[in-house]
Amino acid sequence: MGKTGGTSFRVFIESNVKKHYFGYGKTHVLTHEDLDIRDPSKFTELEPKGHSVFEHFDLFSEHAPWGLHRYLKTKEYQYITMLREPVSRTISAYRYAMDRGWINEDKNIIDWFHEKENKDKKHYQINYCSGVSIDAPLEIKLDKALINLKSENFLFGLTSKYNEFVDLCCLVNDWKPQYRRINITKAKKEISKDDRKELEELLLDEINFYEEAVNIYNKKYKKVTI
């Protein structure tokens, strides 16, 4: 998922898996949460080697929802992701869009949030963890997302406990750790208290989901000695 673990986490995973496939812009058409974008037939247009990649590679790395396992031959698969406090994640996505020049610096974060192309932001992590259509009722998406988080095929951590999750991944998969370095970044656009408060209201479903995910994380991995 975008703006959770970052490039550091992807590099950590790829350093531990010999045959990794960075399918950015390719595999998402198989599982995209927006059914207007999800189009499995498009994958063979984007990937010259077609579905044979699912038999060759051991890691598929991209911002894509739950569901890619349906295209794998093996039944032994593992989803790995990190979850982030929703307001913090949304602000990070907004600043990233600004840094990339996708929006002007005078664009208010609330106005940006309500733009049509950002309709996924309200339930962003719920959508990704559920693999259900973005337009499905919240109850269906939420139930599926929580079921997936509890699955043994889903290894997840929290951005706030980054190094702890790296250790967990290493313990579960017998990997070598690679911890995040402290980055020095340029000054960031400040978000007003009023805008933060409004984001909390807009992201209430995501916040409730995140809090439940934290509870699942604590119960699921409490017996794991790190």
Regions found by a protein language model. Name each.
Residues M1-R10:
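Glycine-rich phosphate-binding P-loop
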Residues G5, E85, C169, E206, ...:
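A residue-level signal for conserved active-site and pocket-lining positions in enzyme catalytic cores
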Residues R10-E14, D167:
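Short, hydrophobic alpha-helix immediately C-terminal to the catalytic nucleophile
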Residues F12-I13, V172, A213:
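Hydrophobic residues on the short alpha-helix immediately C-terminal to a glycine-rich phosphate/catalytic loop
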Residues I13-N16, Y96:
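Short Gly/aromatic-enriched secondary-structure transition segments
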Residues N16-F22:
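Post-Walker A helix-loop "phosphate-sensing" segment adjacent to the P-loop in P-loop NTPases
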Residues G23, V29-M82, V87-Y179:
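PAPS-dependent sulfotransferase catalytic domain
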Residues D34-I37, E45, E62-W66, G131, ...:
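PAPS-dependent sulfotransferase catalytic core
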